[in-house]
């Protein structure tokens, strides 16, 4: 099994979208690559902790490759917009690919480079090693499964 953490705006939609993909075996939402240890949702929303709302993904690479997974990720975000996805604004809504395995970096860079060909503006999606990931509060986990029709900036149909 492989792992990656993806930030694509509000984590509810990213988790719901990713959880529907064959080969993804586990998802969790949380706060990635900030400066405060174990922040609350309210603290992250204040914009002072440096965290991105993100989705931890465990996947079976014999079913879905990292390249395929990233192609799906690119399809649900606007990677040229800084600190905004859909109606959500703030540093916590930035886009990012946070890797746990250094060996994944070449695939990520190649994927980002390929995706850049689809845009005139530069892609601003962060590509960094995962420095920290704090699981979000329970009510955020599988939020759109528990609350069908809840807010989502991603078209899930």
From Swiss-Prot:
Keyword Lipid metabolism appears in the UniProt entry: no
Active site, renumbered: 10
Keyword Nucleotidyltransferase: no
One Gene Ontology cellular component: cytoplasm
Gene3D superfamilies (alphabetical): Peptide methionine sulphoxide reductase MsrA (3.30.1060.10)
Record-linked SUPFAM superfamilies: Peptide methionine sulfoxide reductase
MF annotations from Gene Ontology: L-methionine-(S)-S-oxide reductase activity; peptide-methionine (S)-S-oxide reductase activity
InterPro entries: Met_Sox_Rdtase_MsrA_dom, Met_Sox_Rdtase_MsrA_sf, MsrA_MetSO_reductase
EC numbers, comma separated: 1.8.4.11
Signal peptide extent: none
Stored Pfam families: PMSR
Keywords of the record: Oxidoreductase
Domain of life: Bacteria
Catalytic activity: L-methionyl-[protein] + [thioredoxin]-disulfide + H2O = L-methionyl-(S)-S-oxide-[protein] + [thioredoxin]-dithiol; [thioredoxin]-disulfide + L-methionine + H2O = L-methionine (S)-S-oxide + [thioredoxin]-dithiol
BP GO annotations: cellular response to oxidative stress; protein modification process
Similarity comment: family membership: Belongs to the MsrA Met sulfoxide reductase family.
Function: Has an important function as a repair enzyme for proteins that have been inactivated by oxidation. Catalyzes the reversible oxidation-reduction of methionine sulfoxide in proteins to methionine.
Name the record gives this protein: Peptide methionine sulfoxide reductase MsrA
Organism of origin: Clostridium botulinum (strain Okra / Type B1)
């Amino acid at each position: 099994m492989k792992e990656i953490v993806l930030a694509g705006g509000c984590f509810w939609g990213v988790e719901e979208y990713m959880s529907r993909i064959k080969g993804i075996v586990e998802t969790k939402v949380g706060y990635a690559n900030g400066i405060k240890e174990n922040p609350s949702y309210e603290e992250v929303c204040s914009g002072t902790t440096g965290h991105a709302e993100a989705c931890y993904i465990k996947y079976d690479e014999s079913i879905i490759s990292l390249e395929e997974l990233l192609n799906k990720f690119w399809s649900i975000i606007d990677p040229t917009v800084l600190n905004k996805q859909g109606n959500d604004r703030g540093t916590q809504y930035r886009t990012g690919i946070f890797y746990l395995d250094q060996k994944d970096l070449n695939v990520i860079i190649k994927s980002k480079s390929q995706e850049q060909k689809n845009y005139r503006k530069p892609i601003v999606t962060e590509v960094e090693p995962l420095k920290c990931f704090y699981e979000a509060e329970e009510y955020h986990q599988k939020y759109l499964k528990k609350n069908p029709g809840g807010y989502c900036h991603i078209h899930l149909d």
